[in-house]
Amino acid sequence: DEAAAVMGDYKEKTPDLVAAVRDAARQEQFLEVVAVAEARRRFHQHLDLAPLAAETVALAQALGRVFAADVVAPIDVPPFDRSGVDGFAVRAADTAGASDRAPRRLRLNAEVIACGHPPVLQVEAATATTIATGGAIPRGADAVVMVEQTELIETAQGPAIDIRRAVAPGGFVGYAGSDIARGETLLRRGLEIGSREIGMLAACGLAKVDVVRRPKVAVLSTGDELVRLGEPLRPAGVYDSNGAIIAAAVSEAGGEPVRFGAFPDDESVLELAVRSALAACDMVVLSGGTSKGAGDLSHRIVAKLGAPGVLVHGVALKPGKPLCLAVAERKPITVLPGFPTSAIFTFHTFVAPVIRALAGLPVDAGETVSARVPVRIPSELGRQEFVLVALVAGERGPVAFPTQKGSGSVTAFSQADGFLAIDALASALDAGRDAEVTLIGRTRMPDLVIMGSHCVALDAVLGRLADQGFAARTLAIGSQGGVTAAERGECDLAPVHLLDPAGATYNRHLVRPGIALVPGWRRMQGFVFRAGDARFAGKTAAQALAAALADPDCLMVNRNAGAGTRILIDRLLGGTRPAGYANQPKSHNAVAAAVAQGRADWGIAIAPVARLYGLEFLPVAPEHYDFLLVESRKERPAVQAFLAALRDPAVRARIAALGMVPADE
């Protein structure tokens, strides 16, 4: 017939082309179409997905990189007690009762404390010293009065100020280590470095940082139809958009793209390029040549690169069915479909997770989330206010806790997951309200929430959880705050160290229905002072305390109300209020810093912190640092991992090395 005659003529003229047409029409089918989960399992089974080796980079080159190791703060930030406002350093007791009608007058000392200049004069009773924002708090002062709340008065004895509003102890004072405490784990390995982390590193004076090496990802495009960008488009040609898209996606995923360019459907040329890419890079990504149609060579070339070779060729995915996944020389190789939509879809499903794993990055999160606000947040009328919040998982969904480190804090943004807005016409956001939280960067909801007292040994436990892929959120709100959070079901665990009312035992009185007690470790609380202080050297803690109370010039540094250490201090003092009692920082580090820097003469802190600051230490009493467990959360994987870490010999050895004693020893 006519068709047979045409085909016969065709065979005589172009026998090679006829064979090609027959092969194309026949089309070898996919080896096996598998489910997405099975494809991922086969692929990952032959890969080492641990982060790549570390490299050291300058701080200026650290943006977007990933910490390869925990960063421990080498200094306190701030390194000294400092003023948060322009005003006058005072003794808070001297301002009691001050008002517009009955101001309190204080004589001005002959000193102006500017930033960068240590104070010289001590603030005595009924005196004040002019101080700038950021200036060091002088000895004797425990608060700062804003200049706006004062009036300069000339008297026969010299200049003085009338104070029209009282200030509480600690008012407008940023304590040493209140932002960053020396020796604490400041930033953890696996965290992506953004501008917030850069600021924290710079605040600690760190010029270099160890980061995970970015995986080098070779990007190749294949096909006779591809045209270079910028060149005229020829008939039947298309621009190589896949190369540009995939290279950008590699960068977004945390990799370093290496553009090898676009290659024609020439098997020998393409094979040479792929082998060169495999030798030079950590991963190879090709686009095109997966469908086993005419001219599709990529999958055949990949199959020749070595064992185990092609693991998947065909995935039950739309779009993206022609995907090819392979491994050679322990390196991942992927051949993405040629159509851009299919290529980028399969890239984000299969390639991006591998790149992020090699780069040490976590999984991306969404952009906004609705969360309940558990506490009332006051706001100034007439101004829209943005409040930084930390997100934790509550019983009825996300809970947004406002961060409270203040405008001078370096870590406020780093420890926040997002922010919420309070309308200009609202005086507050009431407790219990839901708010829309705008997430900052790549936010991951924590797997474990710990709220209460902080201890450096806790970092050893959380480090083990981080190794297992769990993200923990810790909020240092004191033992009493932890008890409240546990009762409201806002945390998984609450670290506490509180004596019962009779002073006989630690923490057992906090157990109640729904809340169990998990033993932690024991740490020694003691009397800390500077080496060489003859008032305390060679004495017992009781003798040293008696000597301190007998000397009116001997300044103490206290702890904040609600802290377990504060309860111990008040028991030791028996109702007395020695000089410095109103100085109430919120951490052991701040206490040690005050003593070490001569702003106080003694305080109560734990032994490891005393050693860290080079202070003498007189033991007072062992303290039980335990955990309240919200029993409804006990079976959560992260909680079980935490409980297992407490029993882990390596973790226990680390705790012991820090000067603590595990509870059952």
Protein language model features and the residues they cover:
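N-terminal segment of the mature folded domain
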Residues: 465-540
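Flexible glycine/proline-rich
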Residues: 37-40, 55-60, 68-69, 82, ...
